[in-house]
A protein has these predicted regions:
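Amphipathic, Lys/Arg-enriched alpha-helical "gate/interface" segment within cytosolic domains
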Residues: 3-6, 11-37, 42-110
Length: 110
């Protein structure tokens, strides 16, 4: 797991390719990321499935309650099948764009 911080955003990358152990590490350290927007970068793990992404829903919901963004970067996923509560995009650039838009919405009171 690799963690990069840029401004109010933390990017967490899966470097091992083992989603289960990655999810455990992220879940154990979730309180350290509560004050930041989070990007979960799974783009280097082609074996990630929709079922795996759904395991991130509790983390995403908790983060949204704290008025912070939670975006997942994954490739090879049917984006139409992803639950609406989970933001999944195909690239890091789009993840940063989603966070910017959500911050503007929060600033405007939406």
């Amino acid at each position: 797991m690799k963690v990069d911080q840029k401004g109010h955003t933390i990017t967490i990358k899966d470097t091992q390719g083992d989603f289960t152990s990655f999810l455990d590490k992220v879940s154990q350290s979730k309180t350290a990321f509560d004050t930041h927007n989070v990007i979960i970068d799974l783009s280097h793990n082609p074996s990630v499935t929709l079922a795996d992404l759904k395991l991130l829903l509790p983390l995403a919901k908790q983060h949204k309650k704290l008025k912070k963004s939670f975006v997942v970067v994954a490739e090879g996923i049917d984006f139409n099948a992803v639950p609406a509560q989970l933001s999944v995009v195909p690239s890091n650039l789009e993840a940063h764009d989603i966070i910017e838009m959500e911050e503007i919405e929060r600033d405007l009171g939406f």
